[in-house]
Curated annotation (Swiss-Prot):
GO terms for cellular component: cytoplasm; small ribosomal subunit. HAMAP family: Ribosomal_uS19. The gene is rpsS. The lineage of its organism: Bacteria, Pseudomonadati, Chlamydiota, Chlamydiia, Chlamydiales. Pfam families: Ribosomal_S19. Transmembrane segments: none annotated. This is Small ribosomal subunit protein uS19.
Length: 88
C-alpha cells in the first residue's frame, strides 16, 4: 500500500533543514545521513549525500531523475557474490 497523497512525501526534518541552509549559502559539501527512508525532493537536486548502508557511507549525487525515489534505493545494503561456475 502506498503513502496517502494527503500526507505528502516523508523527508526527515534535520535533512531538509540542512539542504535548505546549503541552498541559501550556495554550498555543495556532502551531507552525511542515516536517513535512508527520506524521499528525494526537487530542492535536493545537485547536492551530494553520504548515505549509510549499514556498514559504511556511500556517496550519492542527486540528479533530476532521482526525484520521487528514496535515498536508500541508491545505497545497496547487500553484495551479491556470484556462484562458482563448474568447469568440465
Amino acid at each position: 500500500m502506498s503513502r496517502s497523497l494527503r500526507k505528502g512525501p516523508f523527508v526527515d526534518h534535520h535533512l531538509l533543514k540542512k539542504v535548505r541552509a546549503m541552498n541559501i549559502e550556495e554550498k555543495k559539501t556532502p551531507i552525511k545521513t542515516w536517513s535512508r527512508r527520506s524521499m528525494i525532493t526537487p530542492e535536493m537536486i545537485g547536492h551530494t549525500f553520504e548515505v549509510h548502508n549499514g556498514k559504511k557511507f556511500l556517496t550519492v549525487f542527486v540528479s533530476e531523475t532521482m526525484v520521487g525515489h528514496k535515498l536508500g534505493e541508491f545505497s545497496p545494503t547487500r553484495i551479491f557474490k556470484s556462484h562458482p561456475v563448474k568447469k568440465g
